[in-house]
């Protein structure tokens, strides 16, 4: 998600992709030829599969005898056949950290106690929060969790799907960075990500692609930028980030997104509901907006109310210097921000309803 790996740059940068001619079907044909070639060798050795060849060095030989070769190379021709067949893959660790967190949290819930946990995390730790959410549902402890919320503080680089499918009462805080699919399908709770050891105002990429994908609820605060497809299919989640890449808010139907930085191309494609408040930092801003996105509009009283509340929450959760600077310029917000979606013409009743919803989030 830092876009620094050569393989990733080739995949996402049009200027590099243009250097590769051909079609996907040609790659498929290449692998088909390789498979047919392997099959012909298997027939020569009169075996049914590659598994039958593994370890059979007796089928190998030296093509050219060279006296200058070290004698130790002849050891390569010793048979290494084992009674145990290798499965052909390596089993991935099934989430030791996730199981540990679940065990501690469930123990606290059965005693009707809140749990506060701190652990280091690595990118091998995937779907943190999903397992415990499932266990809470299976054991019908949802109401107990709401009354006794759990707070999980982690440090490091979290793996895929950090905070996926979490529910009300689960609060995740990460000092570091996270991979793709943060908050995927989350229905409640909160996720906070604070980059470790950086003072950059919004420039740091703190999380990967498809953040908040398909979320139905909950709150997400990231003190940094995120990758492509931020908020896709969001129907109820609330999030504040400090910039994002292409395809943000695609097919969004509900919820509220606040973007305190630049956006990528194709913003808002197919968006039919919800609201996105964007800080206008780019020249030719309109060029980044999809033709199928809702028309942008000026901020109204509800937008100002929500922006103020969520900026304060963002600062409270992350300590964001960027958000602090923006909060000082409240009188200029109408010029600084534009809004997609939401209610254009508001009444006093609408404002009262918005205030009640914001208060209910605390």
Name each model-derived stretch:
Residues 49, 68-76:
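Short, solvent-exposed coil/turn linker segments
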Residues 15-48, 54-57, 77-362:
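Long, distal/terminal scaffolding or interaction modules
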Residues 1-8, 12:
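Single conserved hydrophobic/aromatic residue that forms the stacking wall/gate
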């Amino acid at each position: 998600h830092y876009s620094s790996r050569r393989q990733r740059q080739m995949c996402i940068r049009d200027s590099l992709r243009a250097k590769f001619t051909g079609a996907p079907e040609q790659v498929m044909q290449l692998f088909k030829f390789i498979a047919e070639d392997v099959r012909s060798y298997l027939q020569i050795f009169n075996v049914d599969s590659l598994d039958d060849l593994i370890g059979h060095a007796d089928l190998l030989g030296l093509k050219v005898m060279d006296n200058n070769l070290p004698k130790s190379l002849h050891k390569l021709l010793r048979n290494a056949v084992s009674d145990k067949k290798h499965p052909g893959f390596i089993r991935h660790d099934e989430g030791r950290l996730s199981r540990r967190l679940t065990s501690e949290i469930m123990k606290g819930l059965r005693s009707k106690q809140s749990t506060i946990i701190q652990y280091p995390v690595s990118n091998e730790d995937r779907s943190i929060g999903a397992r415990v959410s499932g266990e809470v549902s299976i054991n019908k402890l949802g109401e107990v969790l709401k009354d006794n919320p759990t707070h999980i503080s982690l440090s490091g680089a979290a793996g895929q799907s950090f905070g996926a499918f979490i529910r009300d009462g689960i609060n995740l805080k990460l000092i570091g960075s996270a991979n793709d699919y943060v908050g995927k399908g989350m229905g409640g709770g909160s996720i906070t990500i604070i980059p470790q050891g950086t003072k950059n105002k919004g420039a740091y990429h703190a999380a990967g692609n498809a953040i908040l994908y398909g979320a139905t609820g909950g709150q997400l605060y990231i003190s940094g930028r995120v990758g492509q497809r931020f908020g896709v299919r969001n129907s109820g989640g609330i999030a504040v980030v400090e910039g994002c890449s292409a395809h943000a808010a695609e097919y969004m139907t509900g919820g509220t997104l606040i973007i305190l930085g630049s956006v990528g191309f194709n913003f808002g494609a197919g968006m039919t509901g919800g609201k996105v408040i964007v800080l206008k930092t780019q020249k030719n801003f309109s060029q980044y907006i999809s033709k199928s996105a809702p028309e942008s509009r000026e901020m109204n009283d509800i937008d100002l109310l929500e922006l103020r509340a969520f900026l304060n929450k963002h600062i409270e959760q992350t300590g964001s210097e960027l958000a602090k600077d923006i909060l000082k310029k409240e009188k200029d917000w109408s010029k600084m921000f534009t809004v997609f979606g939401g209610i254009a013409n508001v009444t006093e009743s609408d404002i009262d309803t918005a205030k009640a919803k914001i208060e209910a989030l605390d």
